Amino acid sequence: MPAVFMLASSSALQCGRGVPRFPRTEVGAGHSVNEETKAEKVGNQTSVIPATSRQAALGTSWTQRRTQPLQERSHWHPRGNNASGMGGHRMFPGPLRGPAAQVLENECGSLGRAAEGRS
């Protein structure tokens, strides 16, 4: 059970870490406004191309950001005796301990159970 919780909390932390990153890409959002105004002059097809390429670029940078903390965590947090029960609780910041954390735990808890069933 503690192993499942550790897995759930680490993936929940990852979910939580990914959420604030999206609003920070407002530079890209502002960029799309420029693209749309250009597209009105030229035509619809021009707006389609930059949007997809921007999404592709966003996708790659997001996956890189997402895998990096995982690799770091695996160094100082092997899935062995270190996975003590309270260690998982410490991963969650204080303010998050609420309905939002509950939702994250529920979603990622099912992920953990699925992963445990697979192994």
From Swiss-Prot:
Compositional bias (Polar residues): 43-71
Main location: secreted
GO cellular component labels: extracellular region
Keyword list, A-Z: Glycoprotein, Secreted, Signal
Signal peptide: 1-18
Glycosylated residues in this chain: 44
Highest rank taxon of the organism: Eukaryota
Locations listed in the record: Secreted
Region (Disordered): 23-100
Protein name: Uncharacterized protein EXOC3-AS1
The organism of origin for this protein: Homo sapiens (Human)
Lineage of the organism: Eukaryota, Metazoa, Chordata, Craniata, Vertebrata
Gene behind this protein: EXOC3-AS1
